[in-house]
Amino acid sequence: IVPPDVAQLQMQAAQASGDATAMKRAATALQMSQYYDEARRFSSMVTERSRTLDTPIYVVTGGGPGIMEAGNRGAHEVGGRSIGLNIVLPHEQAPNPYITPELCFQFHYFAMRKMHFVMRSIALVCFPGGFGTLDELFETMTLVQTGKSRARPILLFGRAFWEKLIDFQHLVDSGMISAEDLGLFHYVETAEQAWERLAEHYGFDLSGTVEGDYSDDS
């Protein structure tokens, strides 16, 4: 997922080419670019509002381009620090330039990288993505469902995308999961809705003042 300005340039180039397939791809990229902006806004919001907490919340991403870049960028733009857990791959990916340099870590194994994501997170926020996003989502839900990891907000940005991709109700109807398991995650559409979910779960108000202890690692 690319930034809206990049998506707009791609659309202009596709229109100039007259290639119908290219124009369709560019239109999809332009539509999906809204999530880049929303991830960027959410990261800025978390970084700014958590500054009043005893323990600030730091955005952690996979360190690469797209939505990962947007997450680090949002924190960077408000003068905050953010973490990148990058993965060494043969054809990608270089760390994005918005990660706090001393908080950029390189991993060789996906399993170790994912373990650190789960161990250190107080929430999982998923934007539309591919196999890697799905892997991290289902791993986290499985660990919470089975009691192997503490409960935390699992937020899925973009209900329309996720409901088209995964029919969770079918899993319930087929007896593969319980109806209660649908409560493991919540759909959100905006940065504000996501922050409200975090505030509700951990007991801090919408400005960031905390009433309870959100940093419990039990």
Predicted regions and their residues:
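Glycine/serine-rich loop-strand microenvironments at binding/catalytic pocket rims
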Residues: M11-R25, H108-L124, M141-K148
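C-terminal functional extensions of proteins
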Residues: L156-S218
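Glycine-rich beta-alpha loop segments
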Residues: I1-L85
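Phosphate/pyrophosphate-binding betaalpha-module
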Residues: V60-T61, P65-F127, F131, F138
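Short, solvent-exposed amphipathic alpha-helical segments in soluble enzyme
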Residues: H76-E77, E139-V144, H170-D173, Y202-G203
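Residue-level recognition of the N-termini of beta-strands and the immediately preceding loop/turn
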Residues: T55-Y58, A151-P153, L182-F185
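Short, acidic/small-residue loops that bind anionic groups at enzyme active sites
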Residues: G79-E92, F127-P128, M141-L165, A179-E180
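Solvent-exposed alpha-helices and their adjacent loops that cap or buttress functional pockets
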Residues: S50-D54, H76, N96-I99, H116-R120, ...
